[in-house]
């Protein structure tokens, strides 16, 4: 299989609380075309618990995945026999869901004699902008997906160098925890963003974590604690209190992330030269305030900003299919004994930053 061939790939995503399948075409020139993208969210199943329950998530994937795949194939107008490959997210993620998706992909591949591609969920986010915008390597990636917040130099398919990472909470986690703390509905991230629009970001003097450091790492646990402390002083909270707390929290996150991205882009330029673009991927990139901040950061360093459409920032099958197609074009396929993985580094040689060896920063 070579990059001179057009490739049709089915992608399956089940790492968390979205059941998704999609079909993409990778043309001979390396450009992409999305033929279908079906996503079924489990929000209603998890809302009563205020967060994702792994057992419920896995069972929901089992219940609906076959139908989601059938819908994706039907919308694309593609038969299984026409596929060049079938890709599934093999991690990182909730292991029950990962098993469901990967096992289903193996069955399809086995029955139809189709190559299997086991995709790293984070790599799929990292490569999505090449589907939507045909961006060339190397580019600087701001990845904010689930429990991950990282700045990564994307040098090629399978070639990633981490420039910065969170040493505690990821951005998405912090938004969700603040929402739960303030009694906002699940999923919390969009609720905090919505409340912040009606709030005063200057009412509370929240800290701006890691500001001015030479490294490009993130930390949000102290900010989260500061919000909790201020909320505790105001009990019971009225709606405007909640709006102002969310606005202050989001403003602090934006300033901190902008500073950390500035450091990351400087490190990128020192090691690899100017990036072809600043790229954002992952669910947090769907936040409109974060998108505005990213535009300002990109303008400041005079680089192009690429952010996929919101539907391709959150978890979806298209990104898995595309990553599978990119790998397949290089002849990278997997065997039937490929194991699902709850943890899977995007950059295999990464080590925790100095002084943070005992934190999650190495993951």
From Swiss-Prot:
Protein name (database record): tRNA N6-adenosine threonylcarbamoyltransferase
GTP-binding listed as a keyword: no
Family stated for the protein in its record: Belongs to the KAE1 / TsaD family.
Residue positions binding Fe cation: 121, 125, 315
Matching InterPro entries: ATPase_NBD, Gcp-like_dom, KAE1/TsaD, Peptidase_M22_CS, TsaD
Enzyme type, top EC level: transferase
Residue sites binding substrate per the record: 143-147, 176, 189, 287
Cellular component terms per the entry's GO annotation: cytoplasm
Main location: cytoplasm
Cofactor note: Binds 1 Fe(2+) ion per subunit.
Keywords: Acyltransferase, Cytoplasm, Iron, Metal-binding, Transferase, tRNA processing
Any one of the GO BP annotations: tRNA threonylcarbamoyladenosine modification
Pfam families listed in its UniProt record: TsaD
The EC number(s) this enzyme carries: 2.3.1.234
Domain of life of the organism encoding this protein: Bacteria
Species of origin: Rhodopseudomonas palustris (strain ATCC BAA-98 / CGA009)
Compartments, as annotated in UniProt: Cytoplasm
Reactions accelerated catalytically: L-threonylcarbamoyladenylate + adenosine(37) in tRNA = N(6)-L-threonylcarbamoyladenosine(37) in tRNA + AMP + H(+)
């Amino acid at each position: 299989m070579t990059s001179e061939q057009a490739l049709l790939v089915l992608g399956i995503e089940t790492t968390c609380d979205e059941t998704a399948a999609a079909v993409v075409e990778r043309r001979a020139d390396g450009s992409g075309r999305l033929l279908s993208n079906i996503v079924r969210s489990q929000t209603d199943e998890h809302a009563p618990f205020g967060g994702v329950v792994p057992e419920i998530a896995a069972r929901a994937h089992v219940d609906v995945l076959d139908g989601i795949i059938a819908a994706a194939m039907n919308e694309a107008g593609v038969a299984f026999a026409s596929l060049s490959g079938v890709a599934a997210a093999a991690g990182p993620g909730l292991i029950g869901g990962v098993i469901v998706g990967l096992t289903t992909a193996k069955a399809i591949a086995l029955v139809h004699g189709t190559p299997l591609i086991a995709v790293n969920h984070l790599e799929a986010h990292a490569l999505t902008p090449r589907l939507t915008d045909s961006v060339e390597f190397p580019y600087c990636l701001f990845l904010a997906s689930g429990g991950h917040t990282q700045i990564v130099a994307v040098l090629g398919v399978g070639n990633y160098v981490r420039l910065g990472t969170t040493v505690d909470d990821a951005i998405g986690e912090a938004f969700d925890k603040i929402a739960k703390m303030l009694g906002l509905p699940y999923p919390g991230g969009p609720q905090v963003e919505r409340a912040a629009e009606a709030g005063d970001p200057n009412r509370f003097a929240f800290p701006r974590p890691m500001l001015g450091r030479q490294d490009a790492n993130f930390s949000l646990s102290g900010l989260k604690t500061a919000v909790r402390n201020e909320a505790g002083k105001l009990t019971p909270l009225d709606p405007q209190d909640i709006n102002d707390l969310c606005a202050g929290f989001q403003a602090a996150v934006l300033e901190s992330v902008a500073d950390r991205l500035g450091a990351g882009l400087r490190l990128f330029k020192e090691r690899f030269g100017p990036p072809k673009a600043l790229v954002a991927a992952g669910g947090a990139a769907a936040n409109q305030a974060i998108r505005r901040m990213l535009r300002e950061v990109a303008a400041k360093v005079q680089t192009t900003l690429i952010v996929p459409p919101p539907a391709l920032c959150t978890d979806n099958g298209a990104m898995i299919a595309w990553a599978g197609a990119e790998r397949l074009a290089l002849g990278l396929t997997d065997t039937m004994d490929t194991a699902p993985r709850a943890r899977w580094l995007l950059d295999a040689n990464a080590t925790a930053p100095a002084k943070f060896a005992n934190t999650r920063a190495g993951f």
